[in-house]
C-alpha cells in the first residue's frame, strides 16, 4: 500500500502539467523499482513480485500501481476533453493560437509550437474516437463532430 500511495502520487502533478520524455518516465520507474526492491550491501534483495504484476489492479492480484505512460496518456486525454468543452478562457487562448480558422478535427502540430499542444494533438485521434455529441439545440457541427457514433463526416 505504501508503494501505491507514495510512488503513484509523486509524479501525478508533473504529468498533469508537462510532457516529460519517455526516458524520464523509464528513469522514474527504475527509481520506483529500486525503492520497492532495494538493495542490501551484500547484493540485491529477493523480488517478491514482478514489476508487471504491480501494474495489475488489486482484483487481478496486482498492487494497483499505474504505469506512468498510462497516467500521462490519461492526463493528455483529459486535456483534450477539457479543450473540447469550449467553456474556458484557456480554450479561447489555445483555439486562437493554434486553430485560427481551422476546426479541431484538423488540428496538427507544427515545429516550435507548445509541448502541451503537441501532447494534445498526439492524443486527439484516440480522444475523438470516444467522444460522441448529442444534438439537442442544433449546436453540433454537422460536418466535423461525431454525432452519429461513426466518427466525423469530414473523415469519411
Tell where the protein language model's regions lie, with residue ranges.
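A helix-boundary/hinge signal
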Residues: 1-156
Amino acid at each position: 500500500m505504501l508503494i501505491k500511495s507514495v510512488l503513484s502520487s509523486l509524479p501525478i502533478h508533473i504529468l498533469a502539467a508537462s510532457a516529460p520524455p519517455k526516458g524520464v518516465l523509464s528513469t522514474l520507474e527504475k527509481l520506483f523499482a529500486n525503492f520497492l526492491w532495494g538493495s542490501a550491501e551484500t547484493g540485491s534483495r529477493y523480488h517478491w513480485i514482478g514489476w508487471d504484476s504491480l501494474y495489475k489492479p488489486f482484483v487481478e492480484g496486482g498492487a494497483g500501481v499505474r504505469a506512468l505512460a498510462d497516467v500521462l496518456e490519461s492526463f493528455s486525454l483529459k486535456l483534450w476533453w477539457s479543450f473540447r468543452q469550449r467553456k474556458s478562457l484557456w480554450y479561447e487562448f489555445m483555439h486562437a493560437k493554434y486553430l485560427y480558422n481551422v476546426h479541431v478535427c484538423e488540428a496538427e502540430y507544427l515545429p516550435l509550437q507548445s509541448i502541451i499542444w503537441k501532447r494534445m494533438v498526439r492524443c486527439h485521434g484516440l480522444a475523438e474516437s470516444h467522444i460522441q455529441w448529442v444534438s439537442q439545440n442544433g449546436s453540433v457541427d454537422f460536418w466535423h463532430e461525431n454525432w452519429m457514433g461513426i466518427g466525423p463526416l469530414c473523415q469519411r
